[in-house]
């Protein structure tokens, strides 16, 4: 910092009249002692001591207070002189009554001088003011106060001198001590101020350095930004120049392209005009040619179409006639076949009626014989085995309904059965077979089946022969099986007459060898042990051993006398 600032900011020195300091208190005490010995109190009126005391107190207060203006001091002296005036006037009136002498006037002047000298000990200012006041009062011809002479001894003056010497010495020492203290305090304050200023200076330097660094950073950033801006400006100017060049090129290209399109449009319009002109000429020429050749061309086309249509019609008529003849011949054949089939159906229906009646009669006879001799017969002949029977052709007949369509179908089946061999039906169905035990409900509702086995050499007669019958408890529960065996000798005359009359009747209506009728009741569910016991009872096993030989003889005789066995099976 500069020297001017240090001078302005110098510390303020303490006042010499501060209360509580050592110098001021010592001086005050010495000053009081001086007033005791040096001040001579004149003998005034009763009010003068109080006024003098007040005046001295004001002087003391003025010493300890701040210095006042000279105008105020003069006003105080005037007030003091005016207050003393009435007392002086009172004394003067008393003296006028007695005229003064010259000695008395000299005494008064000496007292006045001593008074003024005593006042000068207090303060030269006040003494001057009083002298001025006295002069003014003398000038105004006011009588002065008569003060009696105050004698001061020499001892007191010596004491005052000693006291003043002591006071001046102590004042000097105290003033020097205070000055040294002030100097030290000033130096310390100056050092502290310098230290604070150095710290502030260092802080300011650091702040300024940081600001300088920041400003340098900002400067660098501004420089880089300015460089970038310059680059951007240069790039933009370069781009603008290129864009201007491009725009110029585009402008020239568009002008050239517009000229080219205009030229092409003119060429195209010219070509269209030429094409239109040619088309109009061609249309006119075609109309003229068409009007000339239209009549001849139409006639020729009509003749050609008519000829082609006639040829097609002739071909179609020939084809249809050939197809019609073929269909007529086929229709005649079909009608002849229908007539033949109808005749065959009539014959078949007659033979079926005869066979059905024979079966019904045999069934009735067997049923009557079964119910009559059921309890009397205990033994029976066992039926022959399946292996001993000779295979013979068999025909299966199905009971036809009454309608004509089914009769024709059954007649056709009979013809096919005559020409094709089928398996032989056995003459006897064993009573203990599994069919009697586990037959289903569908078999219970099946229609009647008639099986016939014929031979070309012999025809059995209608003579009834005795036949064995077996009825078991199982058969009585599950269903009823009626086995009928009819044996007859061949009747040659009857066979020859039937062969000569009709082959179909001979094949269909031979004498019946055996009829098997089954009447099934609802099937009962049995266990395996019950079915085995029902299949092989004890009575059947015992009778099979006793009748084995006789059955073999009978089977041999039957095989000799019978060429075939016919069986009818009726299922209710």
Swiss-Prot record:
Sequence ranges of Basic and acidic residues compositional bias: 375-391
Keyword Disulfide bond in annotation: no
Coiled coil: 187-251, 317-353
Major location category of this protein: cytoplasm
GO-annotated cellular components: centriole; centrosome; cytoplasm; photoreceptor connecting cilium
Feature: compositional bias, Polar residues: 89-101, 395-418, 542-562
Region Disordered: start-end pairs: 1-27, 44-111, 375-419, 542-572
Centrin-binding (CBR) repeat coordinates: 143-174, 232-263, 264-296
Subcellular location: Cytoplasm, Cytoskeleton, Microtubule organizing center, Centrosome; Cytoplasm, Cytoskeleton, Microtubule organizing center, Centrosome, Centriole
Keywords linked to the UniProt accession: Cell cycle, Coiled coil, Cytoplasm, Cytoskeleton, Repeat
Top-rank lineage group of the source organism: Eukaryota
One GO process term, biological-process aspect: eye photoreceptor cell development
Record family assignment: Belongs to the POC5 family.
PANTHER family, alphabetized: CENTROSOMAL PROTEIN POC5 (PTHR28618:SF1)
Biological role: Essential for the assembly of the distal half of centrioles, required for centriole elongation. Acts as a negative regulator of centriole elongation.
The name this protein goes by in its record: Centrosomal protein POC5
Gene transcribed to yield this protein: poc5
């Amino acid at each position: 910092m500069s020297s001017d600032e240090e001078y302005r900011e110098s510390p303020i020195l303490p006042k010499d009249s501060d209360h509580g300091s050592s110098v001021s208190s010592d001086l005050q005490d010495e000053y009081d002692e001086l007033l005791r010995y040096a001040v001579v109190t004149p003998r005034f009126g009763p009010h003068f001591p109080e006024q003098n005391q007040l005046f001295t107190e004001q002087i003391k207060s003025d010493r300890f207070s701040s210095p006042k203006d000279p105008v105020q001091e003069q006003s105080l002296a005037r007030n003091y002189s005016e207050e003393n005036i009435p007392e002086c006037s009172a004394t003067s009136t008393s003296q006028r009554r007695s005229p003064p002498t010259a000695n008395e006037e000299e005494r008064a002047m000496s007292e006045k001088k001593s008074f003024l000298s005593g006042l000068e000990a207090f303060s030269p200012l006040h003494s001057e003011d009083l002298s001025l006041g006295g002069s003014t009062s003398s000038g105004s011809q006011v009588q002065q106060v008569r003060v009696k002479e105050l004698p001061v001894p020499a001892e007191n003056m010596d004491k005052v001198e000693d006291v003043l010497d002591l006071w001046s010495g102590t004042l000097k020492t105290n003033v020097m001590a205070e000055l040294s203290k002030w100097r030290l305090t000033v130096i310390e304050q100056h050092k502290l101020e310098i230290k604070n200023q150095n710290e502030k200076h260092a802080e300011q330097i650091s702040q300024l350095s940081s600001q300088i660094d920041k400003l340098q950073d900002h400067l660098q950033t501004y420089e880089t930004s300015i460089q970038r801006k310059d680059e951007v400006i240069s790039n933009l100017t370069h781009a603008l120049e290129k864009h201007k060049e491009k725009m110029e090129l585009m402008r020239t290209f568009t002008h050239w392209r517009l000229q080219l399109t205009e030229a092409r449009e003119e060429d195209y319009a010219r070509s269209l005009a030429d094409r239109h002109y040619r088309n109009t000429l061609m249309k006119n020429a075609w109309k003229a040619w068409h009007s000339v050749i239209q009549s001849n061309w139409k006639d020729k086309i009509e003749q050609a179409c008519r000829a082609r249509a006639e040829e097609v019609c002739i071909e179609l008529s020939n084809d249809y006639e050939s197809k019609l003849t073929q269909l007529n011949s086929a229709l005649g054949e079909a009608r002849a076949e229908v007539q033949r089939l109808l005749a065959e159906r009539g014959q078949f229906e007659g033979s079926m009626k005869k066979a059905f009646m024979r079966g019904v009669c045999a069934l009735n006879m067997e049923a009557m014989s079964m119910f009559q001799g059921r309890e009397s017969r205990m033994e029976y002949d066992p039926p022959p085995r399946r292996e001993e029977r000779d295979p013979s052709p068999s025909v299966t007949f199905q009971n036809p309904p009454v309608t004509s369509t089914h009769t024709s179908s059954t007649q056709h089946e009979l013809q096919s059965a005559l020409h094709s061999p089928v398996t032989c039906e056995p003459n006897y169905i064993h009573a203990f077979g599994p069919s009697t035990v586990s037959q289903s409900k569908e078999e219970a509702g099946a229609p009647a089946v008639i099986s016939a086995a014929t031979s070309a050499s012999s025809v059995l007669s209608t003579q009834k022969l005795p036949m064995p019958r077996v009825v078991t408890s199982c058969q009585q529960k599950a269903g009823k099986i009626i086995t009928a065996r009819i044996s007859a000798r061949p009747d040659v005359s009857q066979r020859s007459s039937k062969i000569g009359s009709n082959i179909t009747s001979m094949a269909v209506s031979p004498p019946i060898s055996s009829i098997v009728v089954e009447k099934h009741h609802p099937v009962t569910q049995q266990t395996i042990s019950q079915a085995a016991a029902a299949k092989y009872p004890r009575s059947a096993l015992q009778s099979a051993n006793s009748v084995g030989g006789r059955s073999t003889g009978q089977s041999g005789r039957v095989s000799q006398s019978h060429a075939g066995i016919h069986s009818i099976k009726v299922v209710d």
